[in-house]
């Protein structure tokens, strides 16, 4: 498949736009005139912990007690401690950074198309090409080349600095805001950017640089450098010195090499097209040395709200299934970031096993922040210990496909041993058999009392037997 077009001539909906990504930064191209280009990155987070997770009652032992008591007041306390925390405050959460809006002179009929071979979006006004956009896979910056006079501005989400926005996901909707100081927009020497302070030392902003008919952009944070704006400007200047043609040639070559690693042709246009799109999206939002894809990958809903489900890591098979097929498809460079991340988070997972479950070993919060901490949510899965086994299986599969004995010795076995130690540490013996004190299956019976199944669910049983 050579290219796929947006639905209709144009779309005003962000979730019908065309996705671009380089495994670090993502953009969605949508709109008309103005043309909208979102700017996001996986690691843009407000990582302040919800204070409820620091209470002494936020523990597995207390959760068991509250579930089994049968009293309404205890169930309300259970909901307060473990469920309501997901949406009662805007943090911790992925952050929406905003977008760049382009106004073209005399545009009447804008549409756009995505060439997946080159990961490039072409923008047209009728039969005339007016712009191209790509997120460079080599330099990690966004690049726009325009062929018609245009102006552009930055659109910053209102909910960041005090105007309430909608918090979506987990069947709840409330008015939320981070309450940050208003962002400061600045323009100087061909650069346009904004600076956003938060309630900690963390800061971020979209930075753009214009050189003739080429506009370069990035999203920088204080994780990059204390002088994150200066850091971003230097990156953009280097990209601008190279120029569109050179960057695009190297970017296209990297995608050509990726596509050559494997391919499937069934003769069915729908199946083949879906296959191409899936592996295009996979590389767009996953790459070695960075973070694995959370719920929305490198993109975030551009609707003036917190990301759906706060853009977290959902280990109730959401995250795992995103990486289910990369080994068979020979996409190891892009896929192994998942096991690398889990290993890097091992100390945090060991801490969670100890502080929440009261056991030694490794347990992964099934609804997790970027830095591996619990977010709460429906406790039946967000705080289920067996979700960890799904995550651990990725180590098993990596070893089986690569045959890497050193990986087995230094990564897979230690991780599995830690998970096994933790799971066995919380199980209870009855009549010569081991049972989990609480057992569920993801999202069956939602977040009601019925969702705890007796004695143990097939879901939990299958995972524990595998372990």
Where are these regions (language model features)?
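Long, well-ordered core segments of solenoidal/helical folds
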Residues: 282-286, 340-353, 414-430
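Alpha-helical support elements that line or immediately flank enzyme active sites
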Residues: 145, 281-284, 319-333, 389-405
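Acidic/polar, glycine-enriched structural segments that form the non-catalytic walls/loops
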Residues: 1-312, 331-335, 342-351
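The feature captures the catalytic groove of carbohydrate-active enzymes
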Residues: 143, 297-312, 359-409, 423-467
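Glycine-rich (often Gly-Gly/Gly-Pro-rich) flexible segments and glycine-rich loop motifs
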Residues: 314, 318-341, 345-353, 458-467
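Beta-strand segments within the central parallel beta-sheet cores of soluble alpha/beta enzyme folds
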Residues: 4-5, 294-295, 337-340, 356, ...
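Extracytoplasmic/secreted proteins, especially bacterial periplasmic and envelope-associated proteins
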Residues: 246, 250-254, 266-273, 277, ...
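A conserved hydrophobic secondary-structure block that centers on an alpha-helix together
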Residues: 126-141, 160, 392-414, 418, ...
